């Protein structure tokens, strides 16, 4: 066989080995590339509020009414109200709950093969996502009232009462906290995808405990017996957040994105006059 013939056959055989790749869409991803924590990151990122929602809820509404914004003359400070802002908040908040829920679903129904590390880490990640989902749901029910407990299943869900949602959230936190393994550590890539605690299991556990205490206290007038029992049960699970370094906080950055804080953007200095808001 000539050298040219051997080279040609080698090229054909190589091409045949790669032929199946033509059926793989380069714009899609397979289960082995889907990391559940990407969805949790999407929820955390969105909850920081992009300039559209952040400006309307914080600056035009809260900051103007609280006289924390020097640009007076709009929003509730002059007695006007725009339902568009609250409609947007409803939609945004639903998306944050959806993304946290997706993280949980991807762990409960794996899309690919897990590594030995992922088999240890993902059960913890599920509990962290459950805690964050409760945080998002608490914001939703406190702002809009009844909320669905069986949402994001592809059908229109039924909305449950505030009482039922609160009872569910408290039970969810208790179970999630009890199932966190503080001995499991994330790898470097996983750490980078959690801007709150870098997937530190102990910090997430304390966060869940403190959130349970907070929600219990919100029931202190409406349901004092439940508030007392849940708060005491939360204390029995651990210390909760007691130090500054355990605080749930996300770093803000300048610019026009979810990461730019609504009260600290360089292009919106919100300067205040020394005399504009004096009361005679």
Enumerate the language-model features and the residues they cover.
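Membrane-proximal, proline-rich intrinsically disordered regions
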Residues: 16-75, 84, 109, 113
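Conserved, well-structured interaction surfaces
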Residues: 69-188
